[in-house]
């Protein structure tokens, strides 16, 4: 059971840690762009100071220390989120978005492992605790949970963790539009997960029940497994041709929907060369130099091209047996 007043506890811990220098908020400026070809909204954040940090996705010869094994006490929101000893909640030490939090397994588990029903339910309960019953896309504070799984997903730590952050005000990810007016369902051969046929990259989305009372571990697990079945088909031929490559994917979860995106690369190719994690696949893009920001402002469709470079081609309208790579 998620403890009461979690939102206030995160806020208080964040304010104290920032004041005492235990975390540093990355200075950034953001702007909303719209892709004229796909009509997709993008929230582009410019954070030049991040260009000075080493690339966390680059492998090093020595095994990196686990930052979640003995975290700074000033960053620990709670040592036992559920009261069952499974999870702790930490603050991100270098957030771009204030109060960016990490849902971390108490014992070490591999970031390449699948999400469990408990992982999914705990993440959903955190969303409910932070967001309450408010569901107005425009006026309420909305939160996103995301999971970067595998080396091509944008993951930078080996210890299993999901991330929680507030979504930008008045920002509408394409998954919202895709699920608008649609009831919850589980896929069958005749009812595939939702895909937006206007964007170029493969993604699989299911709307969740409007009432949180109808959401339980079994439902979330069935949604996740059905989406993963579609996503994993992309790796069948790929791994046969290049067996050294590891399966990677992103999971995005809001109170309204769950989305899985298969990944082929962590970084896009020219012209942008962007490091992209889960947040990119709901339209939130981070850039570190002004030239790229200007390129995106001039041609927002470059985002869609970059997302395809890091993923696989859209298969909207195809059955799983018809997917091609």
From Swiss-Prot:
Enzymatic reactions: ADP + ATP + H(+) = P(1),P(4)-bis(5'-adenosyl) tetraphosphate + phosphate; sulfate + ADP + H(+) = adenosine 5'-phosphosulfate + phosphate
Cellular compartment(s): Cytoplasm; Nucleus
Residues the entry annotates as binding substrate: 53, 92-93, 148, 154-157, 163, 277-279, 284, 288
GO CC annotations, alphabetized: cytoplasm; nucleus
Source species, domain of life: Eukaryota
Active site (record annotation): 161 (nucleophile)
First-level EC class: transferase
Cofactor(s) this protein requires: a divalent metal cation
GO MF term list: ATP binding; ATP:ADP adenylyltransferase activity; bis(5'-nucleosyl)-tetraphosphatase activity; sulfate adenylyltransferase (ADP) activity
Gene3D superfamilies: 3.30.428.70
Gene Ontology biological process terms, A to Z: nucleoside catabolic process; nucleotide biosynthetic process
Cited Pfam families: Ap4A_phos_N, ATP_transf
Other observations noted: Present with 1770 molecules/cell in log phase SD medium.
Self-association state and partner proteins as the record states: Monomer.
Family: Belongs to the ATP adenylyltransferase family.
PANTHER family the record matches: DIADENOSINE 5',5'''-P1,P4-TETRAPHOSPHATE PHOSPHORYLASE, DIADENOSINE 5',5'''-P1,P4-TETRAPHOSPHATE PHOSPHORYLASE 2-RELATED
Protein's recorded name: Diadenosine 5',5'''-P1,P4-tetraphosphate phosphorylase 2
Organism listed in the record: Saccharomyces cerevisiae (strain ATCC 204508 / S288c) (Baker's yeast)
Gene giving rise to this polypeptide: APA2
């Amino acid at each position: 059971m998620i403890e009461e007043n979690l939102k206030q506890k995160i806020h208080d811990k964040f304010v104290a840690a920032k004041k005492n220098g235990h975390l540093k908020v990355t200075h950034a400026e953001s702007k909303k762009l719209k892709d004229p070809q796909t009509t997709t909204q993008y929230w582009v954040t410019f954070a030049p100071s991040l260009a000075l940090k080493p690339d966390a996705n680059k492998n090093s010869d020595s095994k990196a220390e686990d930052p979640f094994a003995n975290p700074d006490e000033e960053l620990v929101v709670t040592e036992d989120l559920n009261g069952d000893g499974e999870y702790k909640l930490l603050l991100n030490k270098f957030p771009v978005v204030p109060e960016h939090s990490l849902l971390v397994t108490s014992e070490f588990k591999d970031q390449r492992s699948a999400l469990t029903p408990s992982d999914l339910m705990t993440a959903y309960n955190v969303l409910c605790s932070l967001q309450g019953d408010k569901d107005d896309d425009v006026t309420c504070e909305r939160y996103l949970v995301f999971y970067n799984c595998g080396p091509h997903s944008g993951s930078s730590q080996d210890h299993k963790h999901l991330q929680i952050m507030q979504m930008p005000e008045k920002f509408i990810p394409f998954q919202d539009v895709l699920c608008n007016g649609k009831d919850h369902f589980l896929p069958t051969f005749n009812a595939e997960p939702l895909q937006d046929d206007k964007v170029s990259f493969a993604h699989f989305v299911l709307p969740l029940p409007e009432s949180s009372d109808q959401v339980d571990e079994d439902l979330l697990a069935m949604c996740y497994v059905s989406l993963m079945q579609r996503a994993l088909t992309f790796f069948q031929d790929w791994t046969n041709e290049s067996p050294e490559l590891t399966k990677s994917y992103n999971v995005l979860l809001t109170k309204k929907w769950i989305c899985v995106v298969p990944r082929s690369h962590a970084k896009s190719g020219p012209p942008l060369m962007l490091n992209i994690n889960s947040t990119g696949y709901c339209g939130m893009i981070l850039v570190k130099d002004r030239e790229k920001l200007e390129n995106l402002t001039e041609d927002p469709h470059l985002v869609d091209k970059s997302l395809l470079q890091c993923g696989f081609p859209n298969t909207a309208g195809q059955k799983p047996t018809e997917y091609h790579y």
